[in-house]
């Protein structure tokens, strides 16, 4: 190994450029440099490493013995690194020069290439222009050649057509001398095409010379007219031959032959005759038995007596069979005809106009409004129900046919046209039907009432009573509900038959007006019947009013009759209150029906809903007016009984008890007890029957009448102080009862009565103090003071004069 003092040239090269290539690692380079000088650098576990020498006793180990060698090695390595860097720099300079030289050559080459490419592009442009010019020339030549060929073919065809035209122009009606083309069945399509061309040319020429101005043109025109006639005859004969062949193929179900004939026939009037002929020969249009079978299917086993439900089921079955038949025909039409949509349009139109219309004509026999069918046979309602189901099922059939195919046919408009005569008069028939049902129901109710009257018997004429019908003809909410159900059914028919909002609204208003009339008339008549019972009771009361100078027997009989009249009045009162309650329920049902069903149909049209509300308000007002009259009569009935009880039960001694030293009676008088019991009993039904303002106004009026009646009654008596106490007890009893009226004004009046009764209780000198707190009762109190039994003896009159003077 060289020593550290050796010159650098003596040291071998330790570094090379390859050491720095690839994945360079300084640790690996360092290890390679010092590997020989520092074998322990490889680690204790390095394979083949000799064990360290044993230490020498007494000698100090060197600190780092290889430092000089390493220092020389590192200096030498640094020098090598500098040399390597210079080599690399030199090589880089050489590479840069070479790159610059190559770049210059490359740029020069690119410049020359660009010039060559530009020249090449110019050459291509000139070549493209030349090719385009040659192409245009070739295209023109081709067009000329094609035009020439076309002209040649046209000329050839024209020659042939002129030849054929001359054949048709030879002799009128003579088709025997025609070319074989026109009689060859294998060339029918070609013959048809040529015949149509000749016919078109000849007809055009005849039309152009229709008014000849010269002899020559006239002769030419007459010659072509012969050709036109012969061509027409030939076309007709050819068309008939094709139709016959088409029919034969149709019977054999030879689709290809049918399609061939249909294609050829399409040249004659666009194939209209073939289409119409095919549709007309369908079995459902020519079989005479189909009509009778159809009507049997619709009516079922019940025959002419079939109801609308059976008819609806029958129509569903029949229309399904028709739709299936059309669907099968559509399959054939699609496979045979070149214009299947036109054929389907003709077929569907024929189905609706012939087969469906024939069925509907049998079903929808419009009745006469002047001579309505009997209600036992269904009346007008049967016709309307059948009309609705027929319209509904026919619309379903139309939708089904449209889904199959109907071409450009306006199937919806065609369906509507079938029913137009029925829809034009629908509203009149619906109104007449509702009136007929109402009249029938009223006749039924009258018959039931008569039967009930006959079964229960009549009140004997010996007691002077007449037969009443109010109990048998009471208002029924069930009947009103039935009216609403009729109207709801009619409205459902109306919305089914019509779709335009304005038309629907107009018809709905007319139909709803029938319900308003029916409910108003029924309720008003029911209230009038109930009022008749009140009138009858009033007549009974008036009949048995007698004078004072009669025998005991007559008086007893009259009293018994008055009791009977009172019982009749109470019964009539209850009946009328029940009638009013049912009226209120019926009107509520009517209003609910209007809100739920009628309103939504009227709101889309301006003014329709407010007008209907006004109509309903007018109808309800009529019922309310009748109810108001009856309620006033009820008050008269109650007050008449109150007056009778006051007259018969109130004794003079009730308020003028003898001064015998006995304790005063603080109980109400018998008349008061009887009246309060009567009012409690009779008004119980009124409390439950009346509601809201009706109840409030009725009880307020009754309270005012009761107050006035009691005042007038008490002015017939003379009162002692103890009688005044008893009067006050009566007033308290009456006041407690009328408090159930919930009428503050009535409560106040009876409270003032209680205060006013004090004029009979206080001493004469204390009367003036009674008016200080309540001056409003002064006028009535002054009248009551005169009823004191000591009015004259206590000189109360002079005392009152001084009070009035003050």
From Swiss-Prot:
It comes from the Eukaryota. Residues 77-109 form a coiled coil. InterPro entries: Sec10-like, Sec10_HB, Sec10_N. The keyword Magnesium does not apply. Keywords: Coiled coil, Exocytosis, Protein transport, Transport. The exocyst complex is composed of EXOC1, EXOC2, EXOC3, EXOC4, EXOC5, EXOC6, EXOC7 and EXOC8. This is Exocyst complex component 5. It comes from Oryza sativa subsp. japonica. The gene is SEC10.
